[in-house]
Amino acid sequence: MDIRKIQVTGGSSFVLSLPKSWATKHHIQKNDPIGIITQADGNLLITADIKGIHTQREKELFLKDYPDTECLFRCLISAYITGFTSIRLTSKIRIPSDVRQMVRVYTQMTIGQEVAEENDTSITLKDILNPAEMPLDNTIKRMYTIVKSMHEDAIAALEEKNASLCQDVISRDNDIDRLHWLISRQYHLITHDPSLSRKMNITAGTAMTFFQISRTIERIADHAVTIATNVQNLLLLAEEPDGKIVISAETIQMFRRADEMALTIFKRSMRSFYDRNVHEANAGIVSLTELTALYTELKALSTHQQNPASIYFGYISNSIARIGEYSSDISEIVINHCIGEE
């Protein structure tokens, strides 16, 4: 830390000299304006960027270091999430077709990423999205809407024995991944760029809350996919010679009840977040006890099923319970956020 003494001039003006190395780095000249931002913790931030221009960050990946395209894909996602605005893939030889195909998948799976330049030995990806145009609140609401419909349709597919609906639920998980990665990226940008935080009118602490909730919703989506996948397995089992799903009407009704309980906890937790309501969040946590008791009954029923389908029913009941537990986690995040803001 560079410690400097305050000077008083004219009896009322407080003057602080700037480090020469910093002024030189940012090409500060006499009479140039600089920005002073008061942070939430009372500290002052001095910046040469008075126009609030988004910081440009570049990342170069050499293909010789990433012979595995799956590893390269994960590194591209990491570069995207951590806020790089330009990503360049370079190679000493012609870039293989599988890498180019992977890049196309990457641009389809991310929001705002496009190929800006491309030749035989390099590919440059640019971020064309203005972060301020995608408020975190809107993205969370969209994630909630998609996941809620995934969960409802997964259970409906079980009741209706609808294989195509199962596949539709599974495909929607890609949308959730894209939105979660976007929120993760914006969270990193906000925490590293105070001007963006100011432009989006959101503190780093609030951005962290959005990120935590987004990550939890993404996990709830994974369990909706698990339900849909196991319903598919049940339907395939029924198509086998002499295959028959043996499940009582009572068990179907218990699945429906457990599903409605889990979905109610999810809705309540998200409503408490929108309303910043601690009591609503706490009520969601308390209601988890009833779902846990019903899950215990469902698990026992699944175990006693005398047919190959019992294992799939067990997976489905477990995922319903996990959806309720993750929804309860959202309520805890909401309480932490609300108390922290007081």
Question: Where are these predicted regions, by residue range?
Answer:
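Cytosolic, long alpha-helical scaffolding segments
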Residues: 2-6, 11-13, 17-342
